Amino acid sequence: MEETIRKGSEVEVSSTEEGFADAWFRGILQENPTKSGRKKLRVRYLTLLNDDALSPLIENIEPRFIRPVPPENEYNGIVLEEGTVVDADHKDGWWTGVIIKKLENGKFWVYYDSPPDIIEFERNQLRPHLRWSGWKWLRPDIQELDKSMFSSGTMAEVSTIVDKAEVAWFPAMIIKEIEVDGEKKFIVKDCNKHLSFSGDEARTNSTIDSSRVRPTPPPFPVEKYELMDRVEVFRGSVWRQGLVRGVLDHNCYMVCLVVTKEEPVVKHSDLRPCKVWEDGVWQDGPKQTPVIETPSNVMKTKPMRSCSGAKSMTPKRTTKHARRSLNLEKSAETLTKAESRAATGELRSKRANDVINDNTPLVITPQVKPIASVEPVTPSRVRTATPLKQTKADTQGKSSPKKTLEPMRDENGLENSTRQKVLEEKNSEKKGRKRKRQEEHNSDLKETDESCNGQMAEINDTSSICNDVDDQPLAAWINLPTETSIDHSPIVVNNAAIATDVEERQANDTLMILPFAKKSPFWKMYETQEVCKIAPQSPHFSPLFEAKEELREWTAVGMMVSFYGLLEEVKNLQLDVSPSTLGSLSCSFAELEKHGFDVAAPQSRINKMLSLQDERAKKAEERKGLEKKIEAGEIEGHTYEEEMAELELKILELKRQQVVAKEMKEATDKVTSGMKSYAEMINQEIEDLRLEFQSTASAPW
């Protein structure tokens, strides 16, 4: 070494400092080496600066870490190939590694063992590595590379979690296989980032379990994807599972992501068939099973026919069991489901499922007017009557805009106070007209049937039906159960909502009077609305007696519109609806209930929504707590991984220092052994000189 480097010579310096092992930095030697080689030499670096970043770094280095600059002629004839040990010009120094792959573009992948990493370099950034023995340069042998499935530099895919729910795969490069606590792990580099470095760009690799690694799928050429093909989409730097939902122009597809249900438009090049790595073999991914509509998963709803659009469904015969006695005891025995359905001709057409079905009893109430006087259907379930001050006697027994108020008998045969008052106002012509009802029945029924359905209803055995059944409106014959009010308007019965209410209604079927006359055309339009047929209402509007007379009907109309509007609003509620909105809707329905609206169903639905929202809020809070714990656990796990990586690096450094110390010890022992031999030789020479001296001194004169 003394013959090759001197003060002022350009040298290369290495170090055992963590993070700088196997790296050589250029510098200028500022003092001559000593003969003993034990004194540290001062070196001024050419590429490293002090902490102030202004002046060159100067250090005192042990001679064993200093070597001459390799001469250019030593590189002649060396071809860089896979397995060649090289030095790479990187971060102001020459870093020693091994070429693991030569790319077609003339670039090279270089593997470093401490710390483990793989970096891509240009050819002009590399030089063959030479080792200085102290008096000459030595070339390392070509290293044999591992060619296993997950060897260093192999492209693979690593699983990750996207949106906290979906398992996706991102391309990665295997850096090194390691073993931690007896478990096999891999150090990988995300290949979505550039492998080349520029400036002070810093990147960290990841240490992952072997279960999260799979080989890169081989190319599965697909000329064109079909609808519902299960594919993988390269989106957001990862491969995610999806289904082809649309084939577009320009070789593009609309794909539905399986987990998030997003439907992005992607190019053909960003798709590949869905494959699964199982038992060391690529298998086809799970197929999409088409959903088959069955009676269990498809809601079937039969629309109701309005009176004007329904076909004639009048039964061809009636039964004697259709008779209803106005006596309470007899009616309690005879009014059963079978008898009620027999009275309607055993019709089987159903209304919407949530309103009425075949098992719902149909209630038939006594009628007091000829069927010829039936007016358009009104939405009230209770009987209505024109206020007394608007009545006028109808002496001819024919339909007129103003009907004479006629009382209605109770189910038990008694008369209430209203009946008493009305009977006092009736005249003899009224009684005569009532006796003529049976004779006028057939012609009146024909007239009403033609006006409602446009067809002639066939009526048989009408003589076997009691007067109350004969006077039913035609809507009852087309499976639209009704009652007829005192003013001859058929009224839809909401018997689906209260099936157990039949006996009570039979016992307490008293006359109820609306606080207004139905003059508005709204009531006719109301009948044709589908929602009104699905959820019919019969409010009594009794609180409106306290309102001004001219405001009563329009207030009632507003309430009807508000009720069905609120029903629609409840139906369209979304998951993010606020509890205050639900509370406001509940209060609105409670206010409508005071006017006789049946709000049990919407109130029950609102209460259930509030309960579900409370439960959802609790689950969300529970999930939030778990997410925090998971995040804390992941951070703690990463901390342990970093600590283990640091310990591994320290172990590697200690092993390297051990090797260096062993080499130094062997060299020192060799020198010491030589010096001992030389010392013995000198001792022998000294002894010889002593003997010669004595011989000389004792020689005779």
UniProtKB/Swiss-Prot annotation:
Keyword Coiled coil annotated: yes
Q: Name one GO cellular component term.
A: nucleus
Main localization of the protein described in the UniProt heading = nucleus
Keyword Magnesium in record: no
UniProt keyword annotations, A-Z? Coiled coil, Growth regulation, Nucleus, Transport
Which residue windows are coiled coil? 626-670
Q: Where is this region: Disordered?
A: 299-353, 374-452
Protein name stated in the entry: DUF724 domain-containing protein 6
Q: Which species is the source of this protein?
A: Arabidopsis thaliana
